[in-house]
Amino acid sequence: MDIIFCTPTYCKIMLMIIMLISLRTRCDTNNFLNCSVEKEEGEEEIISTNLKRINDDMNILGRILNDERNIKITDIVEMLQNEYDDKKKKKKKKKYIYRKKKSNNKINEINSVQHFNVKENILNEKKKNPLNDNFKNPKLRKHSPNNKKNKNKIGQIKFHIVGYDKKKITKYLTPSMISSIQKRLMNKNKKTNVNVNMSNGRVLPFFPKEYFLHSSTHEKKDKMATKKNNKEESIINERLLENLENISLSRTIKDIRGEEGNERKVKEEDNNIKEEGNSFKKYFKGVVKLYVDITEPNLEMIWQNYPPKSITGSGFIIEGHLIITNAHNISYSTRILIRKHGNSGKYEAKILYVAHDVDIAILTTDDKTFFDDVYALHFGALPSLKDEIITIGYPAGGDKLSVTEGIVSRIDVQYYKHSNYKFLLTQIDAPLNPGNSGGPALVRGKVVGICFQSYKVSNNISYIIPSTIISHFLLDIHKNKDYTGYAFLGVKYEPLENPSLREALGLEEMERKKIIKKNVGILITEVFEGHMSKQDDKYHDMDNKHHNVGDTHHNVGDTHHNVGDDHTDNLQGDTDYCTYILNSNIITSDKKNIYSDKKKKKIYSDNNNNNNNFNYYYNMHGEDEQSCYGLKKNDIILRVDGKDINNDGSVILRDNETVGFQHLFNEKFINDLCIIKIVRNKKIKSVMVKLYKVKYLLNQHNWDKRNKYFIYGGIVFSILTRSLYVYTQNPEINKLMLYNNFKKKSKDEIVVLKNILPTKITTGYYYTDSIVLRVNNIKVKNLKHLIELIEMTKYTNRLMYLKNNKHTLQSYINYYNTKITSLNINTIIHILILTTSGQKVPIVLNKRDVEKYNEEIKKIYSITRDRYVY
C-alpha cells in the first residue's frame, strides 16, 4: 500500500505554490500564512473572502507543520479528530462517531520520501486497516488491503467526506499532493456532486464541521447563497410559459377564432366547444374556494389591530401546482385554507407572490395530494366585444360552486380599486358578488380574466383582470425571479383637444404643413425629475445588464423594424442616445418613412405625391446627449414606439378600439426603453426614456404593511398613507394630494398628527389629522427624523439644525413661519402643525412631564410599544 507523507519543509513550499496559483498572492518565504494579495479591479471582496477561507485551513496545517518529525496522513487525521473531540466535550454537542486512525509501527519506520511502495510482506500482516471498520459504503470498502481481488488497485486511499449540508465530496489523497490540495482550494465556492450510493448506515463526516470547506464563519453566507440559488428556480414551468407566450394583446378576431378563409372549420370548432361546455365538469375541477383569516390594522388606535375575522373567496388552478386569486382576498391574512370542488377536505395554503398594484396573488400548498384529480386551466387571448363569457366562483349566498353568464361589453384603462392604479381591464355584464373575487372568467374554455370588482351604482357592471395583465405578472416573475412591478412614464399631462391651445403651441401650423398628423399630441405639465434626470445616472446600464426596449418585439411604425434586440444589446455604460436614435430608422407612419442620415446627422422624410406625407427633417447637429433622452415640462408627446397618441390621451389598441395611452407602458417591464417622438420648442425630435417605478409622495397602496407611528406624551404621530388619507377630513391634505404626487427626495414623508389621547399633559389640545411642519424650529423630513428631533439634546439640536435646515416641506406646502427664539430644548418640545382649518398652531410639551407620565399613559391605553418605524 502506498503511504503518503511529507516533511514540514516540503509542505511549506507546496502550499506556497498553491496559494500563488489560486489567488495570485505574494507570500513571505519564512511565513507562508502572511500574504499580500494583488487585488484587481472589482475583485477585492472575492479575494478577501477566499483568502479568509484558505487561512482557516492554513491555521490547521500550520499547527501540524510545527512538528519537526515526519508527518503521515494517518497522524494528520488523528490530530484533527482529537481537536474535534475536545471541542465536542466543551460544547456538549450531540455525540458522533468519527473514523479514527491507528498508527502503524512498521509504517513509522519508513524514511521520508514523497512516494514509497510498501513491500508485500507488510501488506500481508494480519493487521486491520484502521479505515476499514468505519467504511460503511461498499464502494469504498473495495479499496481495503484485506480485499485480495483489489491488490493491484491499492495505489490510492479514498477518503469519503460528507458535509453538514448533505453534499458529498470525494477527495483523493494521492502522491500528487500539489494537484489534490490545489483542486480543493480552487473549488471552495463550487459544489461537487459525486454519485455515491449510500448504505442504510449513516456515513459520518470525515472532517468535523469546524474544518469543513464551508463552515463556521461562512455558515451565514452559505445559507444566503443556498437561498439565492433556490430563488433562482422559476415557478413557471415550460407548459405554462408556452401558454403565456401565446397570449397577445393585439390579436384580432380572426387570430383568435381561426385563419381567414376557413369559416367552416371555425364554426365546427365553436360548436364542439359549446357541446363540451354544456357540462363544464372539467373546468369545475380547476376552481377552488378560499377560507381566509385576516387581522387588519386599526387606523384610529394605530398601535393595535382589529379583532380577527374570516372571509371567503375564489381561485383557480394553473400549470405547475399554482393557484391564482386576487390580492385583496389574502391581504393581512394569518391563515389560508383551500378546498376543491366536490371535496370537503381543506388544505393549508401559502403565498408565493403578491402583486397588489394589479390585485393578483399566487398560492400553493405543500400537500401535493391536493393536486390529484384536478384540472389546470389555460389562458386565452384578450377577448373581443360581444364574446360570450362565463364566470365560475363561490359568491355569497351559498357554499357551493356558482356559474354566471354574460358578454364582454367594454375594454378600457380604468382604476383598480385595490391599488388605485390605472390598468387595462375588461367590463362584462355578468353579475359578480362578494366571494366571486379570484374566480376565472372563461371564453371558449380559456381563462381570459380574473373576477375582481363591480360597479355598485349601476346594475350588471362588473370587471375582470384581463389575461394580458396576468401574463405580464407571471412573465415578470419568470424573468426576474421575483415580482418587480409595473413601469410608468412618470408625467402628468393635459389633453390637446382645444383648437386655440393647439394653435398657441404651433401644432395647427404643423398640421397645415403636413408635418404631423391631425388630432395627435398631449402636453406634459409635470415631470417626475428623479425619473428623467441624467445626473442620477439612471440611463446608464446598471450591473452591466442588457436593457431592451421591452421584452417583446415592439415595432416602430408598421414595418418590421425591431427597436428591441437589434440595437439595445450594446446599451452599456455611457450610451450616446443621440447616436442610438440616429442609427435606428424611425418609422413615423404606414404611409411615410422617416429615415436617419448618419453622415449628415439629419432625420428626414421621403416626399412623394401622396397628400398624407410629411415634409420635414430634423437636424441633429449640436445635439448633446442630455437632450436625446428624457422628457421635459411643456414637451408634446406625438408617438410612443411608433404608435400615435391622440389628442385626448388615447391610443389604438386593435382595429378601431382605443384605450388610454398608459397601457403602452404597462406592456413593458422595469428598465425597458422606449422611443418617444415629441415637439420641443416647436421642433420635432425623438428621445429615449427608460421606464422605472414612480415614487409617489403618497403610496397608492400600503397593503400588508403596518402604518408607521410614534407616540410621545399621548400625541400619536404617523405618516400619511392612502389608508389614512381615505379617513381624513383635512382640506389641506386634499390639496397636498391633488397637486403634489411625486417625491422630491426618496426619503420624504408627510408626517401627520393622527390624534391626541386625553392625558394629564395634553389638556387643551384637541387636534386631529394635522400636518407636522416643524419640531424645535427644524423642518420635519420624515417620521424617523421627527423622532430624532424630539429625543435629541441641545448640542445635537444645533448640529441637526445646521444639517437639515435646507430641507423643507415648503416644496410641498407653502406657509409663513415665525421663529421662536426663546426655546430651552432640554426641557421643552415645540411642535408646529397645520390644522384642518389651515391654521398654524403650536403644541408645547414638557419633557419632564412626559417622562413622569409615560408609563401611566401606556398602561391606560394598552400601548405595548411607543413606536413602529421601518
From Swiss-Prot:
Record's bilayer topology term: Peripheral membrane protein
An annotated GO BP: response to temperature stimulus
Active site residues according to the UniProt entry: 328, 359, 437
Signal sequence annotation: 1-29
Chief site of localization: cytoplasm
One annotated Gene Ontology cellular component of this protein: symbiont-containing vacuole
Compartmental location: Cytoplasm; Parasitophorous vacuole; Host cell membrane; Host cytoplasm
Keywords attached to this entry: Cytoplasm, Host cell membrane, Host cytoplasm, Host membrane, Hydrolase, Membrane, Protease, Serine protease, Signal
Domain note: The PDZ domain is dispensable for protease and chaperone activities.
Subunit structure, as described in the record: Oligomer; may form trimers or hexamers. Forms a complex at least composed of DegP, ENO and HSP70.
UniProt protein name: Serine protease DegP homolog
Organism: Plasmodium falciparum (isolate 3D7)
